[in-house]
Curated annotation (Swiss-Prot):
Organism expressing this protein natively: Arabidopsis thaliana (Mouse-ear cress)
Stated name of the protein: Transcription factor MYB101
Biological role: Transcription activator. Binds to 5'-CAACTGTC-3' and/or 5'-TAACAAA-3' motif in target gene promoter (e.g. alpha-amylase) to promote their expression. Positive regulator of abscisic acid (ABA) responses leading to growth arrest during seed germination. Promotes the expression of aleurone-related genes (e.g. CP1, CP, GASA1, BXL1 and BXL2) in seeds. Together with MYB33 and MYB65, promotes the programmed cell death (PCD) leading to vacuolation of protein storage vacuoles (PSVs) in the aleurone layers during seed germination. Maybe involved in the regulation of leaves lamina morphogenesis.
Gene from which this protein is expressed: MYB101
Lineage: Eukaryota, Viridiplantae, Streptophyta, Embryophyta, Tracheophyta
Keyword Repeat annotated: yes
Region (Disordered): 1-21, 168-206
Tissue specificity: Present mostly in flowers, siliques and floral shoot tips. Expression is restricted to the subapical pith cells of both vegetative and flowering plants and to the hypocotyl hook. Expressed in pollen grains and pollen tube. Mostly expressed in mature pollen grains, and, to a lower extent, in inflorescences and siliques.
Localization per record: Nucleus
Disruption of the gene: reported phenotype: Hyposensitivity to abscisic acid (ABA). Reduced expression levels of aleurone-related genes (e.g. CP1, CP, GASA1, BXL1 and BXL2) in seeds. The triple mutant myb33 myb65 myb101 has a male sterility and exhibits slower protein storage vacuoles (PSVs) vacuolation rate in aleurone layers upon seed germination. Reduced production of abnormal pollen grains with misarranged male germ unit (MGU). The triple mutant myb97 myb101 myb120 is impaired in pollen tube growth arrest and subsequent sperm cell release in the female gametophyte thus leading to a drastically reduced fertility.
Primary location recorded for the protein, binned into one broad class: nucleus
Record field: compositional bias (Low complexity): 169-186
Amino acid sequence: MDGGGETTATATMEGRGLKKGPWTTTEDAILTEYVRKHGEGNWNAVQKNSGLLRCGKSCRLRWANHLRPNLKKGSFTPDEEKIIIDLHAKLGNKWARMASQLPGRTDNEIKNYWNTRMKRRQRAGLPLYPHEIQHQGIDIDDEFEFDLTSFQFQNQDLDHNHQNMIQYTNSSNTSSSSSSFSSSSSQPSKRLRPDPLVSTNPGLNPIPDSSMDFQMFSLYNNSLENDNNQFGFSVPLSSSSSSNEVCNPNHILEYISENSDTRNTNKKDIDAMSYSSLLMGDLEIRSSSFPLGLDNSVLELPSNQRPTHSFSSSPIIDNGVHLEPPSGNSGLLDALLEESQALSRGGLFKDVRVSSSDLCEVQDKRVKMDFENLLIDHLNSSNHSSLGANPNIHNKYNEPTMVKVTVDDDDELLTSLLNNFPSTTTPLPDWYRVTEMQNEASYLAPPSGILMGNHQGNGRVEPPTVPPSSSVDPMASLGSCYWSNMPSIC
């Protein structure tokens, strides 16, 4: 117990003890006289001042539920029952707040009435609330929390009413597209809300507006980051069957063909690139932030539906190569293949390695070409007189078109050089033949007599002189001399 008479009440309770159980008429009279003199409140002082052997809580409940003057007794009237049902539909089990709306009725009485009524109607299989109270309760709940399951998306009307919903915008009117998106999605993004007129009218079905079924999401690129992809498009929130029609790459190609002529003057020079970079492309659609929190994978385009480069509509490259647009609507990959073939025919990618699997073969052919060019230069400089005997060969290798020897006729070139080279009258020694046989395994090794021999004015080739040595094998010394005198290739 607490209050002013805590010590006295404790001593009294220890000596005589507090009484429990039903109240008697004498106890009711003592409590009524005390409240008439001292008023309501400070119930713990009742025992000290009146000598009533009851605790403060028991006195308060006895006064509020049985002894107060304005207390109503008996069963609830039909009007009171209707008020209790309405209040319970709005407030729930707030018995004290409900009692404040019913003068003369206590919270305990209201609770007992409701529990008894609920059990009785459940046993009878009747609804807890009347029909009109149920509709009103649903409308009131919609004001606080909107049930997302009430949205009924009409998928069957999607293709009929929203076939032309995709909107292409150029980079020049990016601000206008942003403003149109803001106006179309002006509803709060934190929670989808129904029309307030629908939620407040109990006779209307709370079906949202048709604009709620199709929220527009804008995907656009930053024009400062990539000027080759200066277009944007909007995708409606739709089913999977209609999304394939909306994201048709043929529409994107048509739009690019119409708007790419204005951007041809701003193109940069195309540098030498590999076929893999041309096919893969350096152009990707960067999705903007979605206001409703959708996942990026929902609106991500497939790999075969990504837009192509801005030069896909037959631009003119610096060297005069025309890139024709794809003849059919087979897809963007075919268009890129045709463009790469056109560029390769125009000579832009003449020296580009096709794939990593052919890298070794191409490098070997280039080494051959470099060696052959070096051989031609050496013959033109040091063996001019010998080649002068046959002017056809001299003119052949001094033409401007033979600056760089092609790979296809390398075998024919080597054969012609060996056949037209002046023959020597002096027989070659045995060590020369052995050395030549040892070096036949390397396809890079030229005829050893050409590079190692001393070219004279009469066209004779003399083998190099080897200093005599008794302790070193002449074959080993000749082999090391041969490889040390090899000219540098790269």
